Amino acid sequence: MTERIGKIQTIKGLIEKDELGITHMHEHIFINYLDYFEKPNEQELKMCCLGGGSGSGNSNSNKTIEDLSNEKISLINNHWVQYNYNKNLHNLQLNEMEIAIRELEMFKRNGGSTIVEVTTKGIGRDPLQCLKVSQELNINIVMGAGYYLDKSISQFVQSMTEKQMEDEIVKQCLIGIDDTSIKAGIIGEVGCSFPLTNNEKKSLIASAKAQQRTGLSISIHPGRSQTAPLEIIQILKDSGADLSRVIIGHIDRTIHDINILLETAKTGCILEFDLFGMEISHYPFGGEVGMPSDNQRIEWIYQLIKHGYGENIVISHDIYTKHRLVSYGGHGYSHILFNIIPRMKKFGYSDTDINNILINNPKRLLTIIK
């Protein structure tokens, strides 16, 4: 165990912390998100049926809802998929090795070094496929341990105790994920709904206990309420978690009130703005809550830095659907490096601010402390 202290656990093994480089702290390379598919309605079908005009032979007016759900992303349906990305089955799966390599080669070419792959139990985590990508491109990939939302894990954990879940998370970190010898280097993303379910509370407590045994950080997927992060933080604190190594993800779709944001930051946790590139304000999973723009994200992070929280911020894209990949007309894993960092510099971010967000904060969080 002592040989792990001060190092970072990647999919290929332990590395020195200075080998980490520029890091995206919340991404998915392979994932199956079909549990969260929502069937399109008749109105949406009409929107996506492009008539070809008399005699053109290009009409698709006979398209059915089933067709709309299953068709591949194209120029014709691209905007509809962006707006309703949870209603297309093809879009909800990242499962193509060739495309994964192509997309992450672009990330590497633009200066990226490490991807934290936080796909957990219940949504198609695939460490062996991720290992192939890491070996092919010689990039660091850090895998996640633990459990996703109740909807995806109830079949696995309903009859498990907190201790059994804790032991399973520890096993994924110290021995290997599933039937492999590939070890996780972070706990999470730990799925939380709002309100929390009993299984999710067990998962949170188990994750806090596992953190104490492994020396790893915890990455949280909070429920969609501005008060959800504070509730989760309290449960983790009561369970013995080190809050300075707890990352609250999806801040940008969760907290839109600066006072609540600052109250959350005061707990000492890490605030993760991980939806860069998501610029359509409609958020299918958010009810009445809209999705902010990248410019708003840049402004909020800047305000947090000015309040003294520059060492408590990490960023990412959280790509988990095809439409956000360059191969399907999206921004890809290089959007932050290619587009956002130059905008941050124009906004007034210092080199120190940017290095903290991309390199130093991830390095501190991923370094094993016990």
UniProtKB/Swiss-Prot annotation:
Keywords: Cytoplasm, Hydrolase, Metal-binding. GO terms for molecular function: N-acetyltaurine hydrolase activity; zinc ion binding. One of its GO terms (biological process) is catabolic process. Binds 2 divalent metal cations per subunit. It is found in: Cytoplasm, Cytosol. The keyword Cytoplasm applies. Its cofactor is a divalent metal cation. It catalyses: N-acetyltaurine + H2O = taurine + acetate. A divalent metal cation 2 binds at residues 189, 221, 250. A divalent metal cation 1 binds at residues 26, 28, 189, 318. The keyword Membrane does not apply. Coiled coil: none annotated. GO terms for cellular component: cytosol. N-acetyltaurine hydrolase catalyzes the hydrolysis of N-acetyltaurine into taurine and acetate. Belongs to the metallo-dependent hydrolases superfamily. Phosphotriesterase family. PANTHER family: PHOSPHOTRIESTERASE-RELATED, PHOSPHOTRIESTERASE-RELATED PROTEIN. This is N-acetyltaurine hydrolase.
